[in-house]
C-alpha cells in the first residue's frame, strides 16, 4: 500500500490523500484551501479519475463536511462512489439548498457508513471511528490492505461535547499501526491558547454575558457547529432566555435526526425568518419546510415586547432587518463565536460596519475544533505507530520533537507503507 498527500503537508485545510494498492486507488477528503479564490475548480488535484470516470479509482472517502475537506466534491465525476457518514449526507443535502451556487448532491453516487461498522471500498477495508470535532458526524479511519494498517485522524479534539470519544478510540484494537496521518492545526500553540478552552467553558462564559445583558443578544456562530448550538441553547436555559434561529438552522438541526438536540419545536427555541430568507422561501416554494418548522415562529413584534428574553443566532442575512429596527439595538450585545480570522475577511465587512455604526461591542467566546499539542502527543504515545506523517498543518517540523517515528512528507510525494 502506498499513499500520496496531494495537499495538506504545508497548510491547514484543503486535505486530499490518495491510497493505492493492488491496482486500485482510494481518495480521502477533497477540500478547498482556506485561502482559495473564487475559481474553485483550479484547486482540483491532478488525479486520474476525478474528472473522468476511472474504474481504478474505487471511491472517495469523506471524514467530515467542512469545506476544507469536502469543498471540491461538486467537481468530481458523478459516477465515482462517494462515502460519508449518514448524518453528514443528510446535513449536506439540507444545507446545499441555501448555497448561492446550488449543487444537487443527489446526482452523485452517494454511499453511507456508520460508526465502527467496517466496510470495503475495492481492496481497502475501512473502519470509521466517530470523533469529537466542531463538525457534526466527524470520523477518523482505520484502513487495512495488503496486511498493512493505516490510520487517518481527520480533524479532532477532546474539548467538545463528545470528548469521551478519544478515550473510546484508545480502547479499540488500534495497536500495530504501520502509518498514521495526524492533523496538526494548532500544534504550535501553547497551552494558554483557546485550543484548551472547552465547550463547557463557552457555555459558562455565555451565561455570564447573557445574564449581564439588558437587551437582545446576537451570537454569531456556525449553524453546522452543533456542539456550539447546544452550548448557546444551554446558556439560554440557564439565563432564562429563548434561542432564536432561522429556517436554515432549523433544517440543519432536523438533518441530525437527533431529538435530544434543540430542534425548532423544542421548548425555549423560536423561529425567526429574516427578509432575505422570506424571499428565498417564496422564490423556491419551500412552504412545506416553513410549515414544518413554524410551531414556535416569532416576529419582530414579539422580540420588541421583551428583547431581553431572546438570543438570536446571528448571520449576515439579518443585517437588512436590524438596520430597520434600530430600537432593538439599544442595550444589545454581539458575541462572536467563530475563528477570529474570519472576522477580518471581506465577508464580514458589512457586519463590522454595522457594529461600529451602532456602537455595539464585539465579545469573542470560542473554542477550537482541533487537538492541541498535548492531545496530539497523547494519541501518538497511545497508538505508537511505526510511521507518523503530519497533515493539515503549517508546522510539520514540530512533530519531530514528539516522536522519532515522524516522517515529514511533501505534497505529491508517494510513500510506501
Predicted regions, residues:
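Short, charged/polar "capping" segments at the starts of alpha-helices
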Residues: 36, 88-93, 250-255, 342-346, ...
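C-terminal regulatory/interaction regions
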Residues: 11, 234, 238, 278-417
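Hard-cation-handling environments
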Residues: 192-331, 391
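Short acidic-hydrophobic, aromatic-tinged amphipathic segments that line or gate anion-handling sites
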Residues: 109-115, 271-275, 407-409
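Short, acidic/turn-prone active-site loops that include or flank metal/cofactor-
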Residues: 32-33, 87-89, 156-157, 247-250, ...
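His/Asp/Glu-rich metal-coordinating catalytic cores
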Residues: 1-61, 67-227, 231-238, 242-246, ...
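Short connector loops at secondary-structure junctions
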Residues: 31-32, 185-188, 248-258, 366-375
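Short, aromatic/basic amphipathic alpha-helical patches
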Residues: 94-102, 255-264, 347-356, 399-404
Amino acid at each position: 500500500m502506498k499513499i500520496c498527500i496531494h495537499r495538506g503537508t504545508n497548510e491547514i485545510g484543503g486535505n486530499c490523500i490518495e491510497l493505492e494498492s493492488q491496482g486500485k486507488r482510494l481518495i480521502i477528503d477533497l477540500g478547498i484551501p482556506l485561502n482559495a479564490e473564487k475559481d474553485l475548480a483550479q484547486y482540483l488535484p491532478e488525479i486520474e479519475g476525478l474528472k473522468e470516470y476511472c474504474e481504478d479509482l474505487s471511491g472517495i472517502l469523506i471524514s467530515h463536511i467542512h469545506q476544507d475537506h469536502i469543498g471540491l466534491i461538486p467537481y468530481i465525476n458523478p459516477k465515482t462512489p462517494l462515502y460519508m457518514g449518514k448524518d453528514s449526507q443528510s446535513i449536506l443535502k439540507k444545507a446545499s439548498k441555501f448555497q448561492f451556487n446550488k449543487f444537487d448532491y443527489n446526482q452523485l453516487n452517494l454511499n453511507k457508513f456508520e460508526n465502527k461498522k467496517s466496510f470495503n471500498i475495492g481492496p481497502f477495508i475501512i473502519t470509521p471511528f466517530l470523533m469529537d470535532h466542531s463538525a457534526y458526524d466527524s470520523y477518523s479511519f482505520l484502513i487495512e490492505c495488503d496486511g498493512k494498517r493505516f490510520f487517518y485522524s481527520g480533524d479532532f479534539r477532546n474539548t467538545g461535547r463528545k470528548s469521551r470519544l478519544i478515550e473510546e478510540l484508545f480502547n479499540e484494537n488500534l495497536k500495530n499501526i504501520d502509518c498514521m496521518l495526524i492533523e496538526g492545526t494548532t500544534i504550535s500553540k501553547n497551552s494558554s491558547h483557546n485550543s484548551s478552552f472547552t465547550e463547557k467553558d463557552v457555555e459558562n462564559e455565555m451565561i455570564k454575558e447573557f445574564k449581564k445583558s439588558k437587551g437582545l443578544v446576537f451570537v454569531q456562530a456556525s449553524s453546522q457547529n452543533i456542539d456550539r448550538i447546544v452550548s448557546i441553547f444551554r446558556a439560554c436555559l440557564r439565563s432564562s432566555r429563548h434561542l432564536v434561529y432561522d429556517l436554515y438552522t432549523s433544517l440543519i438541526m432536523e438533518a441530525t435526526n437527533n431529538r435530544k438536540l434543540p430542534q425548532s419545536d423544542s421548548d425555549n427555541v423560536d423561529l425567526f425568518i429574516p427578509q432575505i430568507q422570506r424571499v428565498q422561501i417564496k422564490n423556491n416554494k419551500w412552504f412545506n419546510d416553513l410549515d414544518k418548522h413554524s410551531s414556535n415562529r416569532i416576529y419582530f413584534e414579539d422580540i420588541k415586547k421583551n428583547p431581553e428574553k431572546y438570543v438570536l443566532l446571528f448571520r449576515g442575512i439579518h443585517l437588512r432587518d436590524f438596520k430597520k429596527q434600530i430600537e432593538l439595538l439599544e442595550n444589545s450585545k454581539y458575541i462572536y463565536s467563530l475563528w477570529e480570522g474570519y472576522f477580518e475577511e471581506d465577508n464580514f465587512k458589512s457586519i463590522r460596519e454595522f457594529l461600529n455604526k451602532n456602537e455595539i461591542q464585539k465579545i469573542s467566546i470560542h473554542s477550537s475544533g482541533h487537538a492541541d499539542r498535548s492531545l496530539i502527543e497523547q494519541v501518538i504515545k497511545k497508538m505508537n505507530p511505526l510511521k507518523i506523517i503530519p497533515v493539515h498543518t503549517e508546522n510539520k517540523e514540530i512533530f519531530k520533537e514528539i516522536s522519532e517515528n515522524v516522517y515529514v512528507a511533501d505534497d505529491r510525494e508517494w510513500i510506501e507503507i
